[in-house]
């Protein structure tokens, strides 16, 4: 059953009908559509637009549809234009003409806006749950490796020694901010658009605040035109998903590097690796590569919706139907990535001796030599220059800083004493950095 057609003299072409239909993808809004319709009917009964008996029968019909969809007895199929048409058609088939009163005081414009807010809100809560699982894995990893030393990098060159706990603490902070962004977005999206109608409200005495409260919203939206014509809450959510994807991708990039033969910092579980069809020795980090690759897909969905919305005049335009496929794809993709990342990380092993030996190379304790000289009374800028000369000397001699003799050190500064060797050991370099947020603050 079509929800329109009275002013048309010809049937819509079959190709155009297929082009216009959204049921194949918006059918996943079925539960939200029913939830919104039930709240709408309760309100219509309360304000007297429907009698108590009418409201009760319609609610029973909607509850029956929900139950049958959940059990699989009713399948979402057929030639309905969208999920709203499908639900209303089934309702009319089941309870007769009374079902035609369901849509009183409502447009599909505010109906779909409501469905999407309900769906996105629920998906955001689920996403936070998967983030929490990943954070729990990271926190467990940090506790286990508080004193396990690894090289820290800038410009992909060894810079200073740090710990595994400190390194992953950076990702913990990123994902905590991601969680905070989701919570903030949920607050902004948590307003009910139902009752906005096509864009200009309705002449029926609707109680929009009742519906908002019934559905767990903070309140009803303030402007009926804005309610149906913007998708900023959805764009913001896709941005949040893109930000999470970016953080996941950065972590995956490091996992891919660390897993390579040249780094050899970690061992990935066989459960989260794949092989080669031609090279029998290969053990590839495909899960990490896929998460990294899917980030571009999530970004693309965000920019697709931004581009769709950028030129639309107020109020509703059918272009906005394009919001769903990109949104659903990003939601599904990101949740999948979070689940895989948590399990992959939880099963990953660190090659601790390899990490420690790597941290010794590349003069990563050079800053600590400079700090040592400063504590002996040398200005930092002078110390910086002296240590630069020391590093150049080491490169020519094929030595590391801790391999220099005291006599060699004193060629560059008379301030150097025997205690230099304790000051520049890996443990000292890490645990003496105790300022808030530094690796030494996690050592004890």
Show the residue positions of the predicted features:
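Charged, flexible cofactor/metal-binding loops and thiol motifs
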Residues: 121, 128, 143, 151, ...
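Short, well-ordered beta-strand elements within core beta-sheets of diverse protein domains
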Residues: 40-50, 119, 166, 235-243, ...
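A generic structural-conservation signal
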Residues: 53-54, 151, 221, 382, ...
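Conserved hydrophobic residue
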Residues: 49-50, 74, 263-264, 379, ...
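A helix-coil-helix interface module used to build multimeric assemblies
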Residues: 1-201, 206-212, 274-275, 286, ...
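Short runs of predominantly hydrophobic/aromatic residues within well-ordered alpha helices
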Residues: 37, 84, 88, 234-237, ...
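Glycine-rich cofactor/substrate-binding loops
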Residues: 1-36, 97-98, 279-444
């Amino acid at each position: 059953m079509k929800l329109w057609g009275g002013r048309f003299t010809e049937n819509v072409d079959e190709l155009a009908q297929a082009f216009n239909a959204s049921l194949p993808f918006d059918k996943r809004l079925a539960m939200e559509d029913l939830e919104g319709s039930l709240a709408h009917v309760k309100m219509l009964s309360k304000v007297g637009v429907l009698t108590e008996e009418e409201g009760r029968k319609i609610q029973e019909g909607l509850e029956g549809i929900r139950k049958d969809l959940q059990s699989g007895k009713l399948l979402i199929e057929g030639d309905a234009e969208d999920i709203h048409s499908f639900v209303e058609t089934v309702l009319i088939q089941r309870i007769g003409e009374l079902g035609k009163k369901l849509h009183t005081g409502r447009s599909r414009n505010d109906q779909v806006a409501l469905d999407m807010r309900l769906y996105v809100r629920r998906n955001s809560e689920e996403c936070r749950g998967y983030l929490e699982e990943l954070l729990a894995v990271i926190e467990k990893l940090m506790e286990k490796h508080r004193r396990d030393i690894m090289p820290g990098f800038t410009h992909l060159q060894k810079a200073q020694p740090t710990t595994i706990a400190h390194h992953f603490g950076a990702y913990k902070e990123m994902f905590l901010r991601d969680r905070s962004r989701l919570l903030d977005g949920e607050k902004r999206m948590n307003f009910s658009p139902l009752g906005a109608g096509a864009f200009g409200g309705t002449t029926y005495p609707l109680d929009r605040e009742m519906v908002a409260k019934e559905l767990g919203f903070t309140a009803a939206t303030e402007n009926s035109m804005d309610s149906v014509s913007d998708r900023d809450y959805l764009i913001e959510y896709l941005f949040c998903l893109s930000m999470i994807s970016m953080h996941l991708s950065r972590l995956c990039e490091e996992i891919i590097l660390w897993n390579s033969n040249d780094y050899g910092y970690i061992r990935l579980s066989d459960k989260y690796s794949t092989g080669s069809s031609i090279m029998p020795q290969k053990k590839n980090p495909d899960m990490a590569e896929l998460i990294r690759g899917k980030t571009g897909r999530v970004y693309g969905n965000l920019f697709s919706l931004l581009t769709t919305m950028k030129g639309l005049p107020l109020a509703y335009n059918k272009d906005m139907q394009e919001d769903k496929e990109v949104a659903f794809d990003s939601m599904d993709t990101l949740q999948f990535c979070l689940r895989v990342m948590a399990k992959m990380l939880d099963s990953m092993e660190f090659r601790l001796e390899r990490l420690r030996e790597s941290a010794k190379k590349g003069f990563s304790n050079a800053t600590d030599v400079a700090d040592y000289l400063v504590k002996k009374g040398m200005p930092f800028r002078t110390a910086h220059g002296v240590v630069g000369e020391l590093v150049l000397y080491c490169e020519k001699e094929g030595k590391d800083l801790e391999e220099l003799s005291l006599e060699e050190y004193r060629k560059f500064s008379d301030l150097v004493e025997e205690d230099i060797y304790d000051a520049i050991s890996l443990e000292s370099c890490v645990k003496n950095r105790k300022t808030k947020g530094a690796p030494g603050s996690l050592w004890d």
